[in-house]
From Swiss-Prot:
Originating organism: Arabidopsis thaliana
Membrane topology of the entry: Peripheral membrane protein
Region of interest called Activation loop, as start-end residue ranges on this chain: 186-223
Compositionally biased spans, kind Polar residues: 12-25, 355-369
Catalytic class of the enzyme: transferase
Full protein name: 3-phosphoinositide-dependent protein kinase 2
One MF annotation (Gene Ontology) recorded for this entry: ATP binding
Record's subcellular location: Cytoplasm; Membrane
Residues covered by region (PIF-binding): 78-113
Length: 486
């Protein structure tokens, strides 16, 4: 089992060697964490909706039972971390978050652990993800995009001045406070530079992970695909992709697979919509320069050159956080939820409501049930699944997915039929593990999409969370909703 007592304790001692007159001297330096390890268990919290799901972690809304304080609780699976050699990333994220102090970065309050999991209690951003605002509005106005990107620039300047590269800037990692200000989250891929002002573990700034692929495919710069060392320019490329997505509603290199996305990135195959202003087009074009040293913010002028760009004309950089943010588009699924039920565990009326694509998929509602097959992704359907169908029943959509629980996950085959039925099957034992009660009423059966890979199927009695590695979450939503409205 993973041992992280030292890294998650109240004090950390770093060992290092130095040389004096040819002799090697062992030195140590210790510092106290501002966010200490507490003697809590997850039973001390009322766990609510899932904010996000990663490869080895989940972030859930957690209310402390004794005082009512709400946190975003990051729950990390020790076994998976050890198996996948992610220990260094977890340690580094904890150490870095403890030392960062900026209004545009999520705050770490405390940590705790048990035999199975590590827990980090983070600031809860009740406004959801910037990704949500883009999808609910279709795309953002230029004024909205200018405000949000300016706050990202402000936080990135601080991060880079501290000698850190975030390496996973994207709309899903840009969280919003209840009043609408941006906070950068998820430092699980952070990379400290040699001159970092952050106290880190020995060798954290010099190991070979600087050239390792991390981040998200659609936002990865070409130099990373060519195995070049990480630079601050990596984050500036991702900023350009994010600004493009704010203004257009989609990422600039979107394609059907990661391989195709990478080919478009390497070829710099980018098309600007006609509604982009000249200033917006120019800034994005410069941020997406194939030479990372030429991106605004990465050159000798630093962030001054980025802040002076015409796109940011009128931005009051000194008083940015005191400005009035754009109005947040509410989640339609949460409007009918009564206030007193807010935060109740697994409340299907608003579970996961910080990341729902309610505006997507509506174009398919008028299609007949016979045309649903155009939406469906048939994932290696063969005779193994035929045995689970009733006479005359046919498959409309099927995928190998992970069924996610609070801590663990299990591979299942999710099947939607024309009856209609929704079932999930254990692919190894070939037995039905669950039958999701069908209803044409969206109040009794609805799908909530939190990312291209993650979605929830909600019924009055339970909420089932799934991960589709082939990023067909939205297709599942469309297929089910089209069948409901046939």
């Amino acid at each position: 089992m993973l041992t992280m007592d030292k890294e998650f304790d109240s004090k950390l001692t770093l060992q290092g060697n130095s040389s004096s007159n040819g002799e090697t001297i062992s030195r140590s330096k210790s510092f106290a964490f501002k966010a200490p390890q507490e003697n809590f268990t997850y039973h001390d919290f009322e766990l609510g909706k899932i904010y996000g799901v990663g490869s080895y972690s989940k972030v859930v809304r957690a209310k402390k039972k004794d005082n009512g304080t709400v946190y975003a609780l990051k729950i990390m699976d020790k076994k998976f971390i050890t198996k996948e050699n992610k220990t260094a990333y977890v340690k580094l994220e904890r150490i870095v978050l403890d030392q960062l102090e900026h209004p545009g970065i999520v705050k770490l309050f405390f940590t705790f652990q048990d035999t199975q999991s590590l827990y980090m209690a983070l600031e809860s951003c009740e406004g959801g993800e910037l990704f949500d605002q883009i999808t609910r509005k279709g795309r953002l106005s230029e004024d909205e995009a200018r405000f949000y990107s300016a706050e990202v620039v402000d936080a990135l300047e601080y991060i880079h001045n501290m000698g850190l590269i975030h390496r996973d800037i994207k709309p899903e990692n840009l969280l919003l406070t209840l009043d609408g200000h941006i906070k950068i989250a998820d430092f699980g891929s952070v990379k400290p530079m040699q001159d970092s002002q952050i106290t880190v573990l020995p060798n954290a700034a010099s190991d070979d992970k600087a050239c390792t692929f991390v981040g998200t495919a659609a936002y990865v710069p070409p130099e990373v695909l060519n195995s070049s060392p990480a630079t601050f320019g990596n984050d500036l490329w991702a900023l350009g992709c994010t600004l493009y997505q704010m203004l257009s509603g989609t990422s600039p290199f979107k394609d059907a697979s990661e391989w195709l996305i990478f080919q478009r990135i390497i070829a710099r195959d980018i098309k600007f919509p006609n509604h982009f202003s000249e200033a917006a087009r120019d800034l994005i074009d410069r941020l997406l320069d194939t030479d990372p040293s030429r991106r605004p913010g990465a050159g000798s002028e630093g962030y001054d050159s980025l802040k002076r760009h015409p796109f940011f004309k009128g931005v009051d950089w000194k008083n940015l956080r005191s400005q009035t943010p754009p109005k947040l588009a509410p989640d339609p699924a949460s409007q009918s939820a009564s206030p007193e039920r807010d935060g109740s565990p697994w409340n299907p009326t608003h579970v996961g409501d910080t990341s729902v694509l309610q505006n997507d998929g509506h174009n398919g509602l008028s299609e007949s049930s016979g045309s649903i097959t155009r939406l469906a992704s048939i994932d290696s359907f063969d005779s193994r699944w035929q045995q689970f169908l009733e006479p005359g029943e046919s498959v409309l959509m099927i995928s190998a997915v992970k069924k996610l629980q609070k801590i663990t996950s299990k591979k299942v085959q999710l099947i939607l039929t024309n009856k209609p039925r929704l079932i999930y099957v254990d692919p190894s034992k070939l037995v039905v593990k669950g039958n999701i009660i069908w209803s044409d009423n969206s109040n009794d059966l609805n799908v909530q999409v939190s990312s291209p890979s993650h979605f929830k199927i909600c019924t009055p009695k339970k909420v089932l969370s799934f991960e589709d590695a082939k990023q067909r979450a939205l297709q599942w939503k469309k297929a089910i909703e089209t069948l409901q409205n046939r």
